[in-house]
């Protein structure tokens, strides 16, 4: 059983995966709030409580964090509470297997890397990956499995909250599909802007990528896949997205773990 931890700015996904390579699958998944000042002990208590008896069945652990301080605590947690379980964290020096053809590879978020890795492994062709998180990342991987870059926009919830916070006449609203793109009250108007507006933003970015990037035209075989917590809300309004994979990031983490575990076995004791 592989423990996978995906720490983002606002929420953390904890998953358990069984099997390996093409037989691997996510068997359980939890979503908890990210606390930037969380300690290793607090993380251990939370995760051990979630996975229960599977804690004794772990054969490996892997994780990433877009919050550097939390990644440090994840490392300490794994070393102290599961010392015999091999672990691989996505950080500089870890082999991901995907070339980063960008100006500064160190700037590329670990979540973007593993998403593109998982998409390329799953579809075996050029892909555009749309991750709906606190930010919306639209990333591009070539037919050779190279990370070409992408575009980053504010996330749906972040934008909606910012509009409410900076306007006396607006308030925070539930993210839900309104009756129509033409809202009949303030809540519906904000929902229409969030749902239909961001669907249009993503469709527009995908269209521009297909126009501007060689090998991504309408005549080329390109997979467009979405992932992320708010993706299901927008999927019915998206015209450019063909696939949805809820577990794309967790599977990307698994791929990196499998690539690096031989080196880990040489340094760490076997799992209990």
Swiss-Prot record:
EC number from the UniProt entry: 2.7.1.33
Record: residues binding K(+): 131
Subcellular location: Cytoplasm
Name of the top EC class for this enzyme: transferase
Organism annotation: Mycobacterium ulcerans (strain Agy99)
Catalytic activity, reaction form: (R)-pantothenate + ATP = (R)-4'-phosphopantothenate + ADP + H(+)
Gene Ontology, cellular component aspect: cytoplasm
Reported function: Catalyzes the phosphorylation of pantothenate (Pan), the first step in CoA biosynthesis.
HAMAP family the UniProt entry points to: Pantothen_kinase_3
A biological process term (GO) from this entry: coenzyme A biosynthetic process
Cofactor(s) listed: NH4(+); K(+)
Any coiled-coil regions, as ranges: none
Record's keyword terms, sorted: ATP-binding, Coenzyme A biosynthesis, Cytoplasm, Kinase, Metal-binding, Nucleotide-binding, Potassium, Transferase
Pathway: Cofactor biosynthesis; coenzyme A biosynthesis; CoA from (R)-pantothenate: step 1/5
Record Pfam families: Pan_kinase
Sequence similarity: Belongs to the type III pantothenate kinase family.
Gene Ontology MF terms in the entry: ATP binding; metal ion binding; pantothenate kinase activity
Active site as annotated: 111
Residues bound to ATP: 6-13, 134
Chain residues that bind substrate: 109-112, 186
Self-association and partners: Homodimer.
Details of cofactor binding: A monovalent cation. Ammonium or potassium.
The protein's name: Type III pantothenate kinase
């Amino acid at each position: 059983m592989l423990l996978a931890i995906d720490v983002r700015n606002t929420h953390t996904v904890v998953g358990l995966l069984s099997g390996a390579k093409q037989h691997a699958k996510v068997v359980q998944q939890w979503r908890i709030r990210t606390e930037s000042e969380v300690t290793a002990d607090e993380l251990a208590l939370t995760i051990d409580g979630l996975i229960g008896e599977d804690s004794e069945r772990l054969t490996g652990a892997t994780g990433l964090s877009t919050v550097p301080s939390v990644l440090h605590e994840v490392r300490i947690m794994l070393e102290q509470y599961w010392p015999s379980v091999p672990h691989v964290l996505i950080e500089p020096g870890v082999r991901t297997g995907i070339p980063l053809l960008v100006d500064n590879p160190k700037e590329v978020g670990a979540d973007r890397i593993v998403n593109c890795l998982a998409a390329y492994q799953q579809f075996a062709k050029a892909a555009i990956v749309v991750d709906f998180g606190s930010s919306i990342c639209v990333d591009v991987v070539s037919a050779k499995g190279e990370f070409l870059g992408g575009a980053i926009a504010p996330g749906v919830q972040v934008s909606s909250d910012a509009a409410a916070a900076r306007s006396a006449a607006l308030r925070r609203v539930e993210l839900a599909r309104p009756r129509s793109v033409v809202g009949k009250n303030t809540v519906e108007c904000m929902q229409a802007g969030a749902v239909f507006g961001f669907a249009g933003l993503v469709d527009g970015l995908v269209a521009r990528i297909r126009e501007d990037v060689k090998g991504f035209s309408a005549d080329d075989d390109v997979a467009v896949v979405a992932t992320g917590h708010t993706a299901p809300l927008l999927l019915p309004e998206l015209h450019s997205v063909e696939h949805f994979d809820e577990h794309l990031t967790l599977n990307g983490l698994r791929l990196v773990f499998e690539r690096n575990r031989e080196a880990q076995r040489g340094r760490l004791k076997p799992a209990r």
